[in-house]
Amino acid sequence: EFLGVPDPLLKSSWEHCSDIVMQADTLGFDNILLPSGYALGIDTTAFAAAIATLVKRIRLLMAVRIGESWPPQLARQIATIDRILGGRLTVNIISSDMPGETMDSEPRYRRTVEAMHILKTLLNGEPLDHDGEFWKLKLDPPPIGMVSGKAPPLYFGGLSPAARDAAARGCDVFLMWPDREEMVKGIIADMTARAARYGRTLRFGYRAHV
């Protein structure tokens, strides 16, 4: 009932989570985040594939934790779920540690930048020839692609310098928590400048609990 207060009746389960998404779909919400986390319980990708067969209008913002899946396989999963949804899938990139492991933030965000490049290349239907720090891959795009024929918008959040740089280099929508107007203006100005240094532009959004 209250954010941050555990309630056994509101645990991560198919019944509870599917009810939330179906209610949001019925009430006319445009997009809903499907969070990812080992401690949450149900797997986000499996849940997204299942709920995609039931919703009618809403878009799904599926969170993916970089490192959990081999990027080409993740690209196939994203494209498959997008097909089930009729082209309404968006993706939230998560860059935190794997369960039971720790990695310094700098290499974690470098890995995330590589993964975003791989995903975008394959989901744009382009052949991949990638010689990176974390993956060395040379392969054609998967036979199944996005409904639009293009990679979905990649959402990303994080305020550390490494997180901001990773977002500027690879994401499409930078997510923020609601904050004071002057703080939000400062973040937008900083991220706009960072993205411009890579010849890119960003969109911005809020993440909020309803």
What are the language-model segments listed below?
Residues 42-62, 111, 122:
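Alpha-helix-loop-beta-strand connector modules within alpha/beta enzyme cores
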